[in-house]
Amino acid sequence: MKITVRSSTVVVPAAETPRVRLWNANPDLVVPRFHTPSVYFYRRGGEDGGDACYFDAGRMRRALAEALVPFYPMAGRLAHDEDGRVEIDCNAEGVLFVEADAPDGAVDDFGDFVPTMGLKRLIPTVDFTGGISSYPLLVVQVTHFKCGGVALGIAMQHHVADGFSGLHFINSWSDLCRGVPIAVMPFIDRTLLRARDPPVPTHPHIEYQPAPAMLGSEEPQALAGKPESPPTAVDIFKLSRSDLGRLRAQLPTGEGAPRFSTYAVLGAHVWRCASLARGLAPEQPTKLYCATDGRQRLTPTHPDGYFGNVIFTATPLAEAGKVTGSLADGATTIQDALEKMDDEYCHSALDYLELQPDLSALVRGAHTFRCPNLGLTSWVRLPIHDADFGWGRPVFMGPGGIAYEGLAFVLPSANRDGSLSVAISLQAEHMEKFRKMIFDF
């Protein structure tokens, strides 16, 4: 598919904004230092199908400039303070807005919207060669297809926002674009996530310990260099409401039977299928990384518009033999880990991070999720389909590629039919087996 750039513009805030250095909390600094990619797809049809200004770039840029006034950190740049700690320089240098055409392409060409790295063509490339203060924290691209549909590709620097805050910005931008005021203004003060003084961690925090290595490997996985990686494959699997019901039918019932969240049940199934597809020995330790929003877990709860990263991580750890056993065993392991994530645990995590000499050493990446481990991030409770810029809701929103083997996402359905989709990256030989197992229940 050929994509040509129609225009490329730096959009700055529409009014004067505070020129400050924004301190980053510890959760802002243990996320990967890259731009998180995501892609929205919109089909042209119905009443909006005849709109000559469908996804009008000028209208979108004006709304973007308005949104950058209250969300002013998004228009800034990364910088270092005097101690070398990464902070945000709120200098209003702006964000990149690209308009492009794919004259031979159509929304239907993307099929089930599998998040392969090929989707990155729908997102502007960030040039990192000039150092952390040289590049915008947000880049967006509107790509027009021959069918009349549109893709909105977004890459957002992870130090600036987690999924919840990032969507708060995108959805506020879309509201402004269709003439609706911002519902919840951003709260920009990350000192709410300071560690206690003095910091007193009360838990061991295995989530920040090195990921288990494959038994028999020569050196710990977290300390290894960059070995030659096997080829990977990415796919997406849609489980209907009926499929999820059949999964639950495998669980114990009756008086006294445990009640499991949908995430715990689906997570146990994905963890089991991945472990079996990978051929893990029963005694092989495997860790599941579950991103957890701390907003409703911390006491007092954070303001609704808190803008930043409030992500903590639950990490169920078990031998593969237990994971590949009954669905209930896996779900119990996951749910027990999630239930520990209360106010005290989250504050303990903040304290633990405060005591670490180098937070960059804890940043997760390919070494974290690769075999025998897994990351499973749920977007089910995030408002990922609310970005209506005035021309309708997206028919799909998901990650704009999955960079790491062993990383997976759970996505809700755009039409609210109760289905859930699992997008996952695995070694190619493991994916062949995983495809046969994911619907075998």
From Swiss-Prot:
EC supergroup of this enzyme: transferase
Family: Belongs to the plant acyltransferase family.
Source organism: Avena sativa (Oat)
Presence of keyword Phosphoprotein: no
The protein's Enzyme Commission number: 2.3.1.302
Keywords: Acyltransferase, Plant defense, Transferase
Active site: 158, 388
GO BP terms: defense response
Induction: Induced by the crown rust fungus Puccinia coronata and the phytotoxin victorin.
Pfam family, one: Transferase
Catalytic activity: 5-hydroxyanthranilate + (E)-4-coumaroyl-CoA = avenanthramide A + CoA; 5-hydroxyanthranilate + (E)-caffeoyl-CoA = avenanthramide C + CoA
Keyword set includes Transferase: yes
GO molecular function, one term: acyltransferase activity, transferring groups other than amino-acyl groups
Function: Involved in the biosynthesis of avenanthramide phytoalexins, which are phenolic alkaloids found mainly in oats. Catalyzes the N-acylation of 5-hydroxyanthranilate with 4-coumaroyl-CoA or caffeoyl-CoA as acyl donors, forming avenanthramide A and avenanthramide C, respectively. Does not accept feruloyl-CoA as a substrate.
Protein name, per record: Hydroxycinnamoyl-CoA:5-hydroxyanthranilate N-hydroxycinnamoyltransferase HHT1
InterPro entries: CAT-like_dom_sf (IPR023213), Plant_Fungal_Acyltransferase (IPR050317)
